[in-house]
Amino acid sequence: NSIVKSGAFQKMEKQKSDINFFASMTAIPSTYRDQITMGLPTEVKAEDITLIGGLNFEKGKIALKTENYTENEAVKALLKKQMESVGKANNTFVKYFPASTLMFFNVGVKGGELYNLLSENKEFRNTVSIAKADEVKELFSSFNGDISAGLINVTMSSAPTFMMYADVKNGNALEMIYKNKESLGLKRGEDIMQLGKDEYVYKTRGMNIFFGIKDKQMYATNDELLYKNVGKAADKSVKDAPYASDMKGKSLFIAINAEAILDLPIVKMVAGFGGQEAKTYIEPVSYTHL
């Protein structure tokens, strides 16, 4: 059969992008493939899905748009369920992340639908024991809205700094995790401690992760200063970033701030030790997003 007669090729031809392309899911990098097939049963094969995309050269930026295509009816039904587990993000938490955030992730989630989708995945069912099923369902179902996460800083002296916020219905899931910490299989030197109402810290030998609920918003961070300022807007936030307008109406959005990354002391040091050529190639790029 000629490739030009395939449904994927014909759909690609109808696009009005500067560059149109399509590729079998088996041919794209595993990190992107795993993101697309998240939660789908293991019996769904990569070759059942084709990635159709378009590249547009716009003023000051290069825009990439992609979608999944399949002629397998069973896979179509599963992809539909996958789409139903996410909704358009409201960008609720962008004001809490500084504009200098190195990598920003934002997704709109319907927790109950996501749990139902994952329940059809054999690996997920095998991982979650019957005894823990209700607790896991409670945790997933508590998510209802935006989940935003950001890589804030990277240094040589400590673990990369991150921050995460999520819309939740209540704090029941976190309270359940704390009360059942003995069954979590914590290793020596690890513990979960309660700092106050709906405030906890997961302590390890190398890092502390502060997490909790504030105003029906779940948070988690490994930086004590960020923890103490939870719920406070940044002076100049992601809301003011050049890519902020591109987030509107998206269910999933990922941005990488190349300017901020190149400005890191650790990157400047690496450039001084022979990484200048790579820096020269990256420097013209301000940011990239998916």
What positions do the PLM features span?
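Intrinsically disordered, low-complexity segments enriched in small/polar residues
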Residues: T37, L51-I52, E58-K61, F143, ...
